[in-house]
């Protein structure tokens, strides 16, 4: 079984979000599971630098100009690169300029990605041809459409990491991207009078996966589907929509081997975690106090992530004796709100605006509770890292958060399945009730340790996801 992942980023070469973490780990897990998985990426500068030994496979003239297809390896995974400097050799973000305006030629830049994904199934590399083209998010959404236009030379899977980003472009670009105009209708890639790369993936793929079972159900409902609910409900009824949970890359995220921590630990040596907490309190300007539960946020600061609720609930958290450490950036209003809280409560609130991968490990190793109060969350990786590190996740019941965290209710404690704290309604009062439950459990150290051990014993490895995808691919053959 030969599988080509078509996507726009891959950790650690280039990362703007969780998609990169998935592509950085899933193909390697699939190779270990017996699938010949490779990755197709645009040759953005950071990616090109990370694979300096890439060799020329072929050169082609395309609707988007002259391209060179390269092939190399990264961490044991075969990587194809679309080398087209006129499209991809730009500093900063792969999607927008320094003023945060989307590049005006994104329609060509990402149509080309989908086109090359299709051409790989038609023999672009004469020595390797995928049985399945697995496209990820809107950037690769045209791959299933091009495959459909070419008579489906390979099966296609389209994974939705976040339905909110839809890749919308003016209809006149149909000529530029060289897809048949017959594809431009409601039973195709047309959406609200424009081309939607996301809808192309949803409509033309042989199977759609979402990154959690709950999110796969949620996106058939209007409040989560951004207008795609009709199509997604139809795909669900046809048995062509399912959810596969993302995993944790244990080579990077494991408290037992994480060299970014002051002290490494396992579920059998949790007392070592205390040194990480002490170091984190010092680094964030918090009072060094092992008796105060340390709550943490590592997130984009947006309303989608529910960070306005954290700001609203913060006085209640602090009144009960808790501390907050926050690492993130985003909405200027939220940034100012958290910075003001840090100034008002020195020693209790520590804030770092920005994102630093290494420091996020230190927070995960040192905090007691990781807050993930998202309004919607397709899968979420932060809570999985929290479980792995014995940093109990406090989450809202939505998407992948609902699939991965079990509330520390009396019943779940008795059944030995409690792993964190879960609240239902997206408001500060509901969040505060969950915070209150966390304080109650914190007051019972032996019970807290029991839940930590339960959380750390859960298996969200990529091997589980790789097996699920392998079974899906074989069903499609």
Curated annotation (Swiss-Prot):
GO terms for biological process: glycogen biosynthetic process. NCBIfam families: glgA, PRK00654.1-2. GO terms for cellular component: cytosol. This is Glycogen synthase. GO terms for molecular function: alpha-1,4-glucan glucosyltransferase (ADP-glucose donor) activity; alpha-1,4-glucan glucosyltransferase (UDP-glucose donor) activity. ADP-alpha-D-glucose binds at residue 15. PANTHER family: ALPHA AMYLASE DOMAIN-CONTAINING PROTEIN, GRANULE-BOUND STARCH SYNTHASE 1, CHLOROPLASTIC/AMYLOPLASTIC. Pathway: Glycan biosynthesis; glycogen biosynthesis. Belongs to the glycosyltransferase 1 family. Bacterial/plant glycogen synthase subfamily. It comes from Citrobacter koseri (strain ATCC BAA-895 / CDC 4225-83 / SGSC4696). It catalyses: [(1->4)-alpha-D-glucosyl](n) + ADP-alpha-D-glucose = [(1->4)-alpha-D-glucosyl](n+1) + ADP + H(+). SUPFAM superfamilies: UDP-Glycosyltransferase/glycogen phosphorylase. Synthesizes alpha-1,4-glucan chains using ADP-glucose. Keywords: Glycogen biosynthesis, Glycosyltransferase, Transferase. Its EC number is 2.4.1.21. It is an enzyme of class 2 (transferase).
């Amino acid at each position: 079984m030969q599988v080509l992942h078509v996507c726009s980023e891959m950790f650690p070469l280039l990362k703007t979000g969780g998609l990169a973490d998935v592509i950085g780990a899933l193909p390697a897990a699939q190779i270990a599971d017996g699938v010949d998985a490779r990755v197709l990426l645009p040759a953005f500068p950071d990616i090109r630098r990370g694979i300096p030994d890439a060799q020329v496979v072929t050169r082609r003239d395309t609707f988007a100009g002259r391209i060179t297809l390269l092939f190399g390896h990264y961490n044991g995974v075969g990587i194809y690169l679309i080398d087209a400097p006129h499209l991809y050799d730009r500093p900063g973000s792969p999607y927008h300029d320094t003023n945060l305006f989307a590049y005006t030629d994104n329609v060509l830049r990402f149509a080309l990605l989908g086109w090359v994904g299709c051409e790989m199934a038609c023999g672009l590399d004469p020595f390797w041809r995928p049985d399945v083209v697995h496209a990820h998010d809107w950037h690769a959404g045209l791959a299933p459409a091009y495959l459909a236009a070419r008579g489906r030379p390979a099966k296609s899977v389209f994974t939705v990491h976040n339905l909110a980003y839809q890749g919308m472009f003016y209809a006149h670009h149909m000529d530029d991207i060289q897809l048949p105009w017959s594809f431009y209708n409601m039973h195709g890639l047309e959406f609200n009078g424009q081309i939607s790369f996301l809808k192309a993936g949803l409509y033309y793929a042989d199977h759609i996966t979402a990154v959690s079972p709950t999110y796969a159900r949620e996106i058939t409902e209007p409040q989560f589907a951004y207008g795609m609910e009709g199509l997604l409900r139809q795909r669900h009824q046809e048995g062509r929509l399912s959810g596969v949970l993302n995993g944790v890359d244990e080579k990077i995220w494991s408290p037992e081997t994480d060299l970014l921590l002051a002290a490494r630990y396992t579920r059998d040596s949790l007392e070592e975690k205390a040194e990480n907490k002490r170091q984190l309190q010092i680094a964030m300007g918090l009072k060094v106090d092992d008796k105060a539960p340390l709550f943490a946020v590592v997130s984009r600061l947006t309303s989608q992530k529910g960070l306005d609720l954290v700001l609203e609930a913060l006085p209640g958290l602090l009144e009960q004796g808790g501390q907050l450490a926050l690492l993130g950036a985003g909405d200027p209003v939220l940034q100012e709100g958290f910075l003001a809280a840090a100034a008002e409560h020195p020693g209790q609130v520590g804030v770092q605006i920005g994102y630093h991968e290494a420091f996020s490990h230190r927070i995960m190793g040192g905090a007691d509770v990781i807050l993930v109060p998202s309004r919607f969350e397709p899968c979420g990786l932060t809570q999985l890292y929290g479980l792995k590190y014995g940093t109990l996740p406090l989450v809202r019941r939505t998407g992948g958060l609902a699939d991965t965290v079990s509330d520390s209710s009396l019943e779940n404690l008795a059944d030995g399945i409690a792993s964190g704290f879960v609240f239902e309604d997206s408001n500060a009062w509901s969040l505060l009730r969950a915070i209150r439950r966390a304080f109650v459990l914190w007051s019972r150290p032996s019970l807290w340790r029991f839940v930590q051990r339960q959380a750390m014993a859960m298996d969200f490895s990529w091997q589980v996801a790789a097996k699920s995808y392998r079974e899906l691919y074989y069903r499609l053959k």
